[in-house]
């Protein structure tokens, strides 16, 4: 705390006052000192309030740092999971494409075999007609 040094002497009327006129009749403390003491008490109260605020700020910052760290770890885990799932989707997509290609081949073979079966059936029918 700053110590206040007066720049001017006390006014003459205060200097001429009797000592019992300058002190509190209840506690015996000089009014001039009492005034400074009360002002210091107010400053201390304000500083204590400010300290509580800053202490709360430190605690809040610590909690926020912990939360940030936790969220950063979660984000990294989500990135890893996302990459893994993206790769899995790609693999499944490739398998699906392969199965679709295979299905198209089998479908063409089936169509070709059905056409051959129709031809064979007609040939058989004609053959039976001719030899019956």
Curated annotation (Swiss-Prot):
InterPro entries: LEKR1. Keywords: Coiled coil. Residues 37-116 form a coiled coil. This is Protein LEKR1.
